Swiss-Prot record:
Domain of life where this protein originates: Bacteria
The organism's taxonomic lineage, starting at the top: Bacteria, Pseudomonadati, Pseudomonadota, Betaproteobacteria, Burkholderiales
Residues binding Zn(2+): 20, 22, 200, 281
Name of the protein in its database record: Adenine deaminase
Described function: Catalyzes the hydrolytic deamination of adenine to hypoxanthine. Plays an important role in the purine salvage pathway and in nitrogen catabolism.
CDD domains: ADA
EC number: 3.5.4.2
Length: 351
């Protein structure tokens, strides 16, 4: 399926919010090598090209293995700052106006990096991005679900001195053998602290994990959630309760959640009234930032301009933003889509 050139231009230019991106997953091979050299960290790859070739993982666990290896070069506030600014520049180029960014402190504290170094490095970059690029953002601290809940509790408590620098908690890493109920108590504690709650569920795990994330963890938003399509009653509930799913199509294909983007349930769930939003996940590893995900999805599925408008609106509707700022972004989206798309200039025929 070939996307209309005018629509392709519109989806590239529409204002968007990115609600599902792991900052460690934006580490491009070039930056990994640069930081490794700066910090004198030995890498098991002789070149940038060899590292990029290693990105040919086959499932979530093999991806996570290389993901954690790449993160080993992050040691100082400057490293976290540089990684974050690299992401911001790419996001701004894709017309991302607001981002709610995941970070995994346990990946770094396990290596002896203080949690303050992690949070301050990322948050300082985002503060500069707000001034330099008018880029709105917030941080969501994620717990690694393959580790014990006690580790999550310790991470949350260690992060409390930096409470003003993040807005919520999430749950990521391998779903298999790590159901939502494993983290019920730490999510209850986060809720007591007034933090927003999100959770990865229904990616490699079953639809029941989506239900459990809602009912046990009290998640306000579900990350991935595509396996909900296997449970029609759950799809109806998601639509009725306006629970947003932060869907990452290129990630789902790369990790073999679906064999082909044409098999992805995004369009079916959108048509069923679910608040679907479209994001990049770990773009350095999955071969696509926001616009690449949007373009590939529109090329693979029977989506039109009305769907694009809805997806852009949904991304801001689902964001943890103050009401006035959210209304301003939604007005910006609606104004953008109220104008008829302009076709790109035609290329002059060869003489």
């Amino acid at each position: 399926m070939t996307i209309d050139a005018a629509l392709a231009e519109q989806i590239r230019r529409t204002p968007k919010a990115e609600l599902h991106v792991h900052i460690e997953g934006t580490l491009e091979p070039e930056l990994i090598f640069r930081l490794a050299q700066r910090n004198q960290v030995a890498l098991p790859y002789p070149s940038v090209e060899a590292l990029r070739a290693a990105y040919a993982f086959t499932d979530l666990q093999s991806f996570l293995d290389i993901y954690y290896a790449g993160a080993s070069v992050l040691l100082t506030e400057e490293d976290f700052f540089d990684m974050t600014m690299d992401y911001v520049k790419r996001a701004v180029a894709d017309n991302v106006r607001h981002a709610e960014i995941f970070f995994d402190p346990q990946t770094h504290t396990a290596r002896g990096v203080p949690i303050g170094v992690v949070i301050d490095g990322i948050a300082d970059a985002l503060a500069q991005a707000r001034t330099e690029y008018d880029f709105s953002s917030s941080l969501i601290l994620c717990f690694l679900r393959h580790l014990p809940e006690e580790d999550a509790f310790a991470t949350l408590e260690a992060a409390l001195p930096y409470r003003d620098r993040f807005v919520g908690v999430g749950l990521d890493s391998s779903e298999r053998g790590n159901p939502p109920e494993k983290f019920a108590r730490v999510f209850a504690r986060a809720r007591e602290l007034g933090l927003h709650l999100v959770a990865h569920a229904g990616e490699e795990g079953p639809a029941q994990y989506v239900t459990d994330a809602l009912d046990i963890l009290k998640a306000q938003r579900i990350d991935h959630g595509v396996r909900a399509i296997d449970d029609p009653a759950l799809v109806e509930r998601l639509a009725r309760e306006r629970v947003a799913l932060t869907v990452c199509p290129l990630s789902n294909v790369k990790l073999k959640v679906y064999p082909d983007l044409r098999d992805h349930p995004l369009k079916r769930m959108l048509d069923a009234g679910v608040v679907i939003t479209l994001h990049s996940d770990d773009p350095a590893y999955f071969g696509g930032y926001m616009n690449a995900n949007w373009e590939a999805t529109f090329e693979a599925l029977p989506l039109d301009a009305a769907d694009a408008h809805k997806l852009a609106r949904n991304s801001f509707e689902a964001a943890f933003l103050p009401a006035m700022q959210k209304a301003e972004f939604l007005a910006e989206v609606d104004h953008f889509w109220s104008s008829p798309p302009k076709s790109p200039p035609a290329t002059a025929p060869a003489a």
